Amino acid sequence: MEQEPILNEHNKQEYPPMHTAEKKTSLIRRGIVFLLLSLIATNASAQDRMFPSKVYANEALRGYETALFDYFNISKANKFACLVEPSYHGEYCLSYNQRDNLLILKRAKKNIWSEQGWTYPLDSQLRNPGKKVDAEEYSLRISDSLADSLQVMFASAILTSSLIGDTLGGLGGVTYQFMLSPRYSSWGAVCWSPKESTNCGQAVAIIEKLCKYVETGDKEAAENLIGEIVRVTNLFRQYYPAGYRHEKTFCI
């Protein structure tokens, strides 16, 4: 028979104490609800900040990164570069050559990780990384204003990167590495397949548009992105500490 509620001296209802099993079930349910709500809240904002540059403990991944840096001549870029790593298509890199005011797009015709990381032995990959994959290369001369606005956007995204930022990676998808001064010290941050509405997603959209315009030689369309670049820069700047004024971009 169901137990009647007990009335205390204040005429308030008190219910019989739950058994241990009931308590555990209740706690588990509350925990599940809390986790679901936390995931919803996290997913809503996690991709608004990038993740600091990756550090590889795995030899194969270190070899892959070395292969990409060599293949795309990233060490020769100055000001900034964005390395794009799709899981199943050819990797590509958008970089800036300050001496000639050129945006340079180099796109591998095959996925270097698949061609070198899986097909060939690891020691071969490390000795001769990425040399067998053909590439297409394009360049577009841009204004100092566009170059400077891109440099500041990269700096803002990188300086506000956080270990509690975007998901670092997953199965499938695309990884974007944003780098400052890769020729010298390479400050960097990454994001992985960000949603379009997030700060990272909007920064990635700018990179993809620029890749398209460099490939098609559309200088006017590229220059018209300055306003959008400034807007996205300000989105990242919202994460600056109170009172912080970003005057330098740590670039050479």
Describe the function of each predicted region.
Residues 47-252:
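Function-determining sites in protein domains
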